[in-house]
């Protein structure tokens, strides 16, 4: 290979880990914070379910470590690229990607922990000797730093790059979401922030050249790892060397025996009863009479009667109840033990068996590794950002452009549904939940709501059905064996003693892990104000 081309590929490879390895230890926190805290997912005895997360929680520790690792890696690569011997176009593209990922990491940090330190340049921090005494920076300043970082990323990035890589419109989509989130930070919604969220999201919708995929479930298939709808994604590699390059979510989320590697243990957790309520269905309803008009339900949670043509393709598809109750078909599986206490198991973040993985990517999966991409910012999210932001300070709108964005998302999910001619804030709020369920995002909607209406966020979380059903297996086994659907309400019922979670205003800010505080005791002190645009520059 010619030296110049070799250098080009070396630079591209150099920034590639930002799409996977530093994020690895956030995978569990991504689900536990984003989905269990928010009431979308049930996991028995989880501190994220009952709001008792403490400073030694392993998943919280790993989450924080991962997010700071992303920032450190992005800073290092960005600094080195500035003096690399390569074309300005290549350097700018890669530097822009570094800044976009850095902004994403800070976006997770500020929404999770509130005020956090700003690490602008690793070398400067090390040379100063103050890296373990940094003060937290006020959340408003952190948001301004994120905005500043994304503005520079947009300046550097091409309008359209290699498929699956971040381009200018991807960064702009994130910028729109940042402005929407920031809009309520002061305690009341800021009209200017909402206007900017609408402006940036509309530009992405109109000018990025990207479209929603026609079929919702296709977004999450292996063959579509790099698709036009996904603006930011973790692109994993199917292997264990080095460890951290791979997707391990199937192990945590799938039922035992779902693949042939003996690495699945997620059957006793799953999408919550409350999320089923949001979709307008119930685990107590017969599959033959269940009102299943929203295609996102089946693409998000598997329930009695569901069969998936994209899982277990070498066996004619994956039959949910057959897998549980037919020991020959479901070898290594639950063997007649219905595990889910909610009547649903996960679909998103699963690739299937090894044959499915080979068909999708051309390479094998293995024990605790796959190459299935994890999408963390999608175009449909930006459509809904626009619909909400376009309302401004109002609680409803008949604006046609907002309706078009909302109806595009809803219309894909529910074929043939009548388009809405007016939408409320509540419509968009619910649509976001259904569209992005189990994608690590819902908790952060509650965080931004709590910025300006904490009581509403608290009331909604307390009213959720976050508990379990009893004896679902009795009904499901009979239905599988003889087609009879009978529910004895004295036996098969939702837990009548379920208690509301202890949600308070402080619940919307996670505690810093002990390790972080030991390393930097100033994390326990009040944050400081920093004029980030004067203090930092790119």
Locations of the language-model features?
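Long, intrinsically disordered, low-complexity segments
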Residues: 67-68, 145, 220-275, 281, ...
């Amino acid at each position: 290979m010619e030296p110049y081309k070799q250098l080009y590929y070396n630079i591209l490879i150099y920034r590639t880990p930002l799409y996977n390895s530093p994020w690895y230890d956030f995978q569990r926190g991504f689900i536990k914070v984003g989905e269990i805290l928010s009431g979308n997912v049930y996991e028995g005895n989880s501190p994220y379910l009952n709001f008792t997360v403490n400073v030694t929680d392993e998943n919280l520790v790993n989450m924080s470590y991962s997010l700071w690792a992303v920032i450190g890696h992005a800073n290092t690569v960005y600094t080195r690229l500035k003096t690399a011997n390569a074309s300005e176009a290549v350097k700018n593209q890669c530097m822009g990607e570094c800044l976009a990922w850095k902004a994403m990491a800070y976006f997770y940090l500020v929404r999770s922990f509130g005020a956090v330190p700003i690490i602008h340049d690793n070398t400067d921090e090390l040379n100063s000797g103050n890296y373990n005494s940094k003060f937290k920076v006020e959340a408003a300043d952190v948001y301004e730093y994120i905005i500043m970082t994304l503005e520079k990323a947009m300046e550097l990035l091409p309008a359209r790059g290699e498929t699956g890589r971040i381009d200018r419109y991807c960064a702009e989509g994130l910028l729109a979401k940042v402005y929407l989130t920031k809009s309520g930070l002061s305690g009341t919604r800021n009209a200017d922030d909402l206007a900017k969220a609408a402006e940036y999201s509309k530009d992405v919708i109109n000018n990025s050249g990207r479209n929603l995929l026609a079929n919702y479930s296709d977004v999450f298939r292996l063959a579509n790892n790099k698709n036009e709808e996904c603006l930011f994604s973790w692109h994993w590699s199917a292997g264990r060397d080095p460890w951290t390059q791979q997707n391990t979510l199937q192990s945590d989320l799938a039922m035992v025996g779902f693949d042939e590697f003996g690495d699945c243990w997620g059957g006793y957790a799953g999408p919550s009863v409350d999320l089923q309520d949001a979709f307008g269905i119930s685990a107590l309803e017969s599959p033959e009479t269940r009102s299943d008009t929203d295609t996102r339900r089946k693409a998000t949670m598997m329930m009695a009667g569901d069969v998936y043509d994209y899982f277990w393709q070498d066996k004619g598809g994956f039959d949910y109840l057959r897998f549980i109750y037919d020991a020959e078909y479901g070898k290594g599986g639950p063997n007649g033990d219905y595990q889910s206490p909610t009547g649903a198991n996960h679909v998103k973040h699963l690739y299937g068996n090894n044959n499915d993985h080979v068909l999708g990517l051309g390479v094998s999966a293995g024990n605790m590794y796959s190459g299935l991409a994890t999408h963390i910012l999608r175009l449909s999210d930006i459509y809904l950002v626009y619909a909400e932001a376009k309302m401004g300070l109002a609680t409803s709108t008949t604006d046609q452009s907002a309706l078009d964005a909302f109806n595009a998302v809803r219309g894909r999910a529910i074929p043939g549904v009548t388009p809405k001619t007016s939408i409320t804030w509540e419509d968009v709020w619910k649509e976001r939940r259904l569209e992005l369920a189990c994608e690590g995002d819902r908790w952060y909607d509650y965080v931004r709501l709590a910025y300006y209406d904490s009581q509403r966020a608290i009331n909604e979380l307390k009213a959720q059905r976050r508990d379990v059903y009893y004896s679902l297996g009795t009904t499901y086994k009979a239905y599988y064996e003889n087609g009879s659907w009978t529910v004895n309400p004295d036996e098969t019922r939702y837990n009548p003693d379920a208690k509301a979670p202890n949600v308070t205003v402080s619940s919307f800010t996670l505690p810093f892990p002990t390790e972080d505080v030991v390393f930097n005791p100033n994390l326990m002190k009040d944050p400081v104000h920093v004029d980030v645009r004067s203090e930092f520059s790119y």
